[in-house]
């Protein structure tokens, strides 16, 4: 009878330690959760505003904006005057 109580208490201690480890690992995950990863790889691709350097038209904000080469030879986001 005493051995069963000792075994039960030992199991209870192991269960409490296990649950504390699980709670601690959820608090400080080893692998960052997607919502915490905004610093290196943001989910939303940020678009570039007017006169920002660009490489493709889809980098620019707005439907009427496009990436075009200016007089200085650099590609920048511009709003098309006909549509914008």
From Swiss-Prot:
Residues 1-25 form the signal peptide. GO terms for cellular component: extracellular region; nematocyst. The keyword Secreted applies. Keywords: Cleavage on pair of basic residues, Disulfide bond, Knottin, Nematocyst, Secreted, Signal. Disulfide bonds join 47-61, 54-67, 60-77. The keyword DNA-binding does not apply. Its main location: secreted. Transmembrane segments: none annotated. Residues 26-46 form a propeptide. It is found in: Secreted; Nematocyst. No specific localization in a particular morphological structure, with a slightly higher expression in the epidermis structures (column and pedal disk), consistent with this peptide having a role in predator deterrence. Negative results: does not show activity on human Kv1.2/KCNA2, Nav1.3/SCN3A, Nav1.4/SCN4A, Nav1.5/SCN5A, Nav1.7/SCN9A, and the human voltage-gated proton channel HVCN1. The presence of a 'disulfide through disulfide knot' structurally defines this protein as a knottin. Toxin with activity against pain receptors. The recombinant protein (which contains an additional Gly at the N-terminus) at 100 nM shows >50% inhibition of the transient receptor potential subfamily V member 1 (hTRPV1) and slight (~10%) inhibition of transient receptor potential subfamily A member 1 (hTRPA1). Is inactive against voltage-gated sodium channels and the human voltage-gated proton channel. In vivo, is not toxic to insect, since it does not possess cytotoxic activity when assessed against Drosophila melanogaster flies. This is U-isophellitoxin-Tst2.
């Amino acid at each position: 009878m005493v051995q069963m109580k000792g075994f039960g208490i030992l199991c209870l201690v192991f269960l409490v330690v296990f649950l504390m480890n699980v709670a601690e690992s959820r608090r400080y995950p080893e692998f960052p959760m997607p919502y915490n990863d905004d610093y290196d790889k943001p989910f939303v691709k940020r678009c570039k505003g007017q006169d920002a350097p660009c490489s493709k038209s889809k980098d620019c904000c707005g439907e009427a904006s496009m990436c075009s080469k200016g007089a200085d030879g650099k590609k920048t986001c511009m709003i098309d005057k006909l549509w914008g």
